[in-house]
Amino acid sequence: MKEKVVSLAQDLIRRPSISPNDEGCQQIIAEGLEKLGFQIEWMPFNDTLNLWAKHGTSEPVIAFVGHTDVVPTGDENQWSSPPFSAEIIDGILYGRGAADMKGSLAAMIVAAEEYVKANPNHKGTIALLITSDEEAAAKDGTIRVVETLMTRDEKITYCMVGEPSSAKNLGDVVKNGRRGSITGNLYIQGIQGHVAYPHLAENPIHKAAPFLQELTTYQWDKGNEFFPPTSLQIANIHAGTGSNNVIPAELYIQFNLRYCTEVTDEIIKQKVAEMLAKHNLKYRIEWNLSGKPFLTKPGKLLDSITSAIEEITGITPKAETGGGTSDGRFIALMGAEVVEFGPLNSSIHKVNECVSVEDLGKCGEIYHKMLVNLLDS
């Protein structure tokens, strides 16, 4: 299995699919799946290409979810080998997308293909949802496919997202949930004027200072057994014209919260509004909800992937919910159990992104064993 996984991973990496471009990656995947009897459905939205492939017609529906798009390479001269050459050096496969996530995508595909070859009349349904819009806006990718499936009353029972979850060793971490993410774009109004005549102006920076102190020190919750406490970080602040003698007319503050299941986005919005009113600030605010928190509690999916990892690697994974958002948040809207597992994440989005060839082979074996655990038991 390892050779097939690595070969497919190299084919995908060699295509410079900077988000939201697919550069033919999904066509390669679809051709292989179609030969095995998978039903292929293309779902393009604007400049994003999405693939929904299925084998089988009954429940449970097990979906592998991944993306073919990658982030930009940065200065290619800093790479030890060209970022889209997919070179293997001392057992390590280098290239943009090697770890995030063309390597695990290849492993999921090969695992599904090998299972179907051996079990053409398997029970349940094996599906793959692949998008080219995960790394950027994520507006025309998985979420649009999910919306389409929900309008057709299609279901996903179990979902494996191939994001690179491992920390120090393959299989040491699986993600069984993610925190929600909400961003506030806050504009606080003042009155512009000359710094020498402050009584004729109103400095929004000075007015906002007590509010910012409260906003950044407020304890939203203490977390729970599955999630760390909700956290807030200010990402951007801007005011003024660049001149040292002009009191600014407006202060812009952008902040983001990664929140757990102890609060909701509505609670967050309400509390921020209360703080702003308390400090008598004139403002307007625009909210952007990237995703709500989701959690897959211990059950058949988590048991199946844990058992598979233990058998292949000898490691018992730790289930965690930290880190950023993923497309798993969209699948969770369908009521599915969602787990993320993939190779080491230490090199993702970096120069010389890479993945161990041995780890890729084991990823394929783990995904395959997970299918066996879910469908053959």
From Swiss-Prot:
Binding, Zn(2+) 2: 100, 135, 349
Catalytic activity: N-succinyl-(2S,6S)-2,6-diaminopimelate + H2O = (2S,6S)-2,6-diaminopimelate + succinate
Gene3D superfamilies: 3.30.70.360, Zn peptidases
Protein keywords: Amino-acid biosynthesis, Cobalt, Diaminopimelate biosynthesis, Hydrolase, Lysine biosynthesis, Metal-binding, Zinc
Record: active site: 69, 134
Leading EC class: hydrolase
Record note on cofactor: Binds 2 Zn(2+) or Co(2+) ions per subunit.
Example GO molecular function: acetylornithine deacetylase activity
Gene Ontology biological process terms in this record: diaminopimelate biosynthetic process; L-arginine biosynthetic process; lysine biosynthetic process via diaminopimelate
Pfam families assigned: M20_dimer, Peptidase_M20
Pathway assigned to this chain's UniProt record: Amino-acid biosynthesis; L-lysine biosynthesis via DAP pathway; LL-2,6-diaminopimelate from (S)-tetrahydrodipicolinate (succinylase route): step 3/3
Its EC number(s): 3.5.1.18
Quaternary organization: Homodimer.
NCBIfam families to which the protein is assigned, alphabetical: dapE_proteo, PRK13009.1
Known function: Catalyzes the hydrolysis of N-succinyl-L,L-diaminopimelic acid (SDAP), forming succinate and LL-2,6-diaminopimelate (DAP), an intermediate involved in the bacterial biosynthesis of lysine and meso-diaminopimelic acid, an essential component of bacterial cell walls.
Family: Belongs to the peptidase M20A family. DapE subfamily.
Protein name: Succinyl-diaminopimelate desuccinylase
Organism from which the protein derives: Haemophilus influenzae (strain PittEE)
